[in-house]
């Protein structure tokens, strides 16, 4: 229910932003809302509207992310890959997309740091097969999955196999995946592809680049 004393929506539960109407934040219990999307506490305040771009590349990235939300069609399976060095606000943008999709279109996403996701899956695989299967199925089928810091280190064969299964399923079933990767900007997309393929696999990287628009942030 809306907070009748909310200064943002004035008790209506909705916020008119011109070309879009959002569900007001007061309708969500903030902690439950953030946990539903698995947003880390550090990014609970992150929104597309409070991202502060400095460079032209950051402004372009913000524009693309807002357009992505506005035009989002869950049947298309389109995604975004944000590429660039640390401290550029890539995670902020991805979190902002997840929140906006849920508020504006009631489409649930789920955020995971890639290393943390693989650690949890590996732990369950070795001790609790039922939890492993349930978590993997959930990640395969969630309408929007955000994988933060993908490809930042070399992965084991097991991790590559799990990522390949996850990405291939989402690719084949046209489910949107959002990616951030902390690579320095390469001279060309071919060099970026080669660098990622060293850590992942050509099949995984090929699908990611086919299904996602790649945005360079610097």
Model-inferred region functions:
Residues 1-60, 67:
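A short, basic N-terminal segment
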Residues 63-74:
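Pre-Walker A adenine-sensing motif
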């Amino acid at each position: 229910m809306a907070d009748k004393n909310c200064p943002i929506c004035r008790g209506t539960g909705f916020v008119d932003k011109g070309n879009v109407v959002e569900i007001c934040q007061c309708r969500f219990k903030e902690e439950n809302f953030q946990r539903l999307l698995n947003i880390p506490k550090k990014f609970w305040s992150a929104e597309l509207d409070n991202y502060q771009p400095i460079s032209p590349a950051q402004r372009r990235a913000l524009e693309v992310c807002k357009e992505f939300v506005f035009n989002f069609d869950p049947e298309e399976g389109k995604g975004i890959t944000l590429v660039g060095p640390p401290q550029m606000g890539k995670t902020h943008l991805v979190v902002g997309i997840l929140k906006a999709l849920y508020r504006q279109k009631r489409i649930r996403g789920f955020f995971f740091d890639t290393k943390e996701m693989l650690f949890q899956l590996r732990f369950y695989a070795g001790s609790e097969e039922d939890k492993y299967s349930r978590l993997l199925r959930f990640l395969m089928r969630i309408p929007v999955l955000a994988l933060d810091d993908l490809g930042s280190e070399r992965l084991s064969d097991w991790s590559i196999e799990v990522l390949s299964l996850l990405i291939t399923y989402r690719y084949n079933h046209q489910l949107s995946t959002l990616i951030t990767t902390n690579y320095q900007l390469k001279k060309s997309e071919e060099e970026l592809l080669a660098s990622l393929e060293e850590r992942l696999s050509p099949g995984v990287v090929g699908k990611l680049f086919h299904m996602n628009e790649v945005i360079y942030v610097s």
